[in-house]
């Protein structure tokens, strides 16, 4: 099985994450940020990835460091779990609606970090969660997973729906990208021969 665990300790956060790419969509989440836990659960469930996250952060300041550092640690774990990338589909995409909302996510496990985040949330906060932290999470993830990620919210009036459809689409696109293609299970999915 393709699994990895990462521990990241800084003066701001103490985080341990574990990922199983060949899981059943189970999640054990204790980030200290309830809305983030709800979003991470979407990745696990829709990505069919088992995900464990335990974090303690400087939440007395705000959730920024915790959210960003969880993104970093999860990106590192994904990069380790996919290893040399032999046999993976490499690319993944998903359109996910949620009532009035529609989001598109496209992934390339290219070895080159890049994020295009095209979303204008209808509110600045969801409950007490600053929506700017969603982009911070994905930026940390992308930088350490070494992936190209395009996120586009194509329609939406409810900020919670916008966020949730993005995370669901990300989970489904990631599931597609990390799936092993049985026709090329011993090949790197690149004409360069390396990713």
UniProtKB/Swiss-Prot annotation:
InterPro entries: IGPD_sf, ImidazoleglycerolP_deHydtase, ImidazoleglycerP_deHydtase_CS, Ribosomal_Su5_D2-typ_SF. Its EC number is 4.2.1.19. One of its GO terms (biological process) is L-histidine biosynthetic process. Pfam families: IGPD (PF00475). One of its GO terms (cellular component) is cytoplasm. One of its GO terms (molecular function) is imidazoleglycerol-phosphate dehydratase activity. It is found in: Cytoplasm. HAMAP family: HisB (MF_00076). This is Imidazoleglycerol-phosphate dehydratase. It comes from Nitrosomonas eutropha (strain DSM 101675 / C91 / Nm57).
